[in-house]
Amino acid sequence: MDLIKIAEEAFATGKQHPSFKAGDTVTVAYRIIEGNKERVQLYRGVVIKIAGHGEKKRFTVRKMSGTVGVERIFPIESPAIDSIEVNKVGKVRRAKLYYLRALTGKKARIKEKRVNG
């Protein structure tokens, strides 16, 4: 067996996360260790891309902090991620939403997909 696969299996978290795609608004609960204290920080934003596959899959979340756009990349199998919650399902036609970086205000909004149920 390949040594890389053995290492990946050893560090796999085994957590189940909900399925989401680009355009969805998600809240990521991320564990942060500061010195000897540990806290959970919630990071809410729009998923602008999902890259990689398998254990190396990662997603980029963009949020507005005041007037500045902040993007953060999270590995999906990170042990520091407590939970991922999907808040809104967006209706987009692209897999990578880089065009949102240039838009501000109401133009940067994403339509919400209606779910019949």
From Swiss-Prot:
One Gene Ontology cellular component annotation held by this UniProt entry: cytosolic large ribosomal subunit
Coiled-coil parts of chain: none
The keyword Thylakoid belongs to this UniProt entry's keyword annotation: no
GO annotation (BP), single: translation
Entries under Pfam families matching the protein: Ribosomal_L19 (PF01245)
Keywords per UniProt: Ribonucleoprotein, Ribosomal protein
Signal peptide start and end residues: none
GO molecular function: structural constituent of ribosome
InterPro entries: Ribosomal_bL19 (IPR001857), Ribosomal_bL19_CS (IPR018257), Ribosomal_bL19_sf (IPR038657), Translation_prot_SH3-like_sf (IPR008991)
Cited PANTHER family: LARGE RIBOSOMAL SUBUNIT PROTEIN BL19M (PTHR15680:SF9), RIBOSOMAL PROTEIN L19 (PTHR15680)
HAMAP family given in the database record: Ribosomal_bL19
Family: Belongs to the bacterial ribosomal protein bL19 family.
Function: This protein is located at the 30S-50S ribosomal subunit interface and may play a role in the structure and function of the aminoacyl-tRNA binding site.
Protein name per Swiss-Prot or TrEMBL: Large ribosomal subunit protein bL19
The organism of origin for this protein: Bacteroides fragilis (strain ATCC 25285 / DSM 2151 / CCUG 4856 / JCM 11019 / LMG 10263 / NCTC 9343 / Onslow / VPI 2553 / EN-2)
Gene this chain is encoded by: rplS
